[in-house]
């Protein structure tokens, strides 16, 4: 019955039209678009904003300085700056490294190895470092923070050997300088400081040198007395032998 109705009434069947979209123009030129219509161009020209023109006498550097001056100081930066200042004041060893391209996993492994040796790896922004060292004896380290960097703090300056041993296996960390016992040292001076013996060894060597000098002094003071005693002993033995020979000759006579 349905087939009969479809044959008798062809309008009852639904057919989906086949559509195909075609572009009869070339590619859209984004870099050099076609000029808009006159009416549209006039509307665009009217709606464009007008900015106040700066005087020609003002340079770009002055404008940038004014923009920087207008920025408000972040209180959190002051907190981090106090933390950096606290690390600098309570650390006997501060090593500054230039940090090349390195993955997060590698820097994490280095941080763990340093932490086992009581060495703490930190990284701060240049603005925070500047805020922390301004007006302090550490202001001379600012030229070392012009690029990506990291800092290692330690309360024991004798850990310089362990620090160099760990960072020698990480070529991405380049030693620039450091602070040892409130004294700024270069890279070569830090390397030389690491080759020096520890404090206990130096004290033992000093005690040995002092004992050797005291022993030599006593020996030199007793030299003449010992020589005199030896000469007198030889002289006494010589006189005794002479007296013995004289007595024997007298008895034979």
UniProtKB/Swiss-Prot annotation:
Claim: Transmembrane helix is one of the keywords in the record: no
Classification via CDD domains: Ribosomal_L10
Transit peptide location: 1-24
GO BP annotations, alphabetical order: translation
Subunit structure: Component of the mitochondrial ribosome large subunit (39S) which comprises a 16S rRNA and about 50 distinct proteins.
Taxonomic path: Eukaryota, Metazoa, Ecdysozoa, Arthropoda, Hexapoda
Source taxon at top rank: Eukaryota
Entry-linked PANTHER family: 39S RIBOSOMAL PROTEIN L10, MITOCHONDRIAL
Compartments in which it is found: Mitochondrion
Name of the protein this chain belongs to: Large ribosomal subunit protein uL10m
Gene3D superfamilies: 3.30.70.1730
Main location (coarse class): mitochondrion
GO molecular function (one): structural constituent of ribosome
Similarity comment: family membership: Belongs to the universal ribosomal protein uL10 family.
Alphabetical list of SUPFAM superfamilies matching this protein: Ribosomal protein L10-like
A GO-annotated cellular component: mitochondrial large ribosomal subunit
Keyword annotations: Mitochondrion, Ribonucleoprotein, Ribosomal protein, Transit peptide
């Amino acid at each position: 019955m349905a087939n009969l109705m479809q044959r008798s009434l062809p309008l009852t069947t639904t057919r989906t039209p086949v559509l195909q979209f075609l572009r009869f123009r070339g590619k859209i030129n984004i870099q050099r678009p076609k000029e808009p219509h006159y009416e549209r161009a006039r509307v665009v020209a009217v709606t464009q904003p007008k900015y106040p023109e700066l005087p020609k006498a003002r340079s770009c550097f002055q404008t940038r300085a004014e923009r920087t001056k207008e920025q408000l100081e972040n209180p959190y930066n002051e907190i981090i700056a106090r933390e950096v200042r606290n690390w600098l004041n309570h650390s006997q060893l501060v090593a500054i490294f230039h940090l090349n391209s390195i993955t997060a996993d590698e820097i994490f492994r280095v941080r763990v190895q340093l932490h086992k040796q009581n060495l703490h790896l930190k990284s701060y922004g240049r603005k925070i470092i500047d805020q922390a060292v301004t007006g302090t004896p550490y202001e001379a380290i600012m030229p070392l923070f012009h690029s990506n960097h990291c800092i290692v703090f330690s309360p024991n300056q004798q850990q310089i050997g362990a620090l160099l041993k760990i960072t020698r296996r990480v070529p991405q960390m380049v030693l620039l300088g450091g602070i040892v016992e409130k004294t700024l040292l270069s890279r070569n001076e830090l390397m030389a400081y690491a080759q020096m013996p520890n404090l206990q060894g130096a004290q033992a060597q000093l005690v040995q040198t002092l004992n050797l000098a005291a022993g030599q002094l006593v020996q030199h003071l007793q030299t003449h007395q010992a020589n005199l005693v030896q000469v007198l002993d030889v002289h006494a033995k010589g006189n005794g032998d002479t007296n013995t020979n004289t007595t024997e000759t007298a008895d034979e006579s």
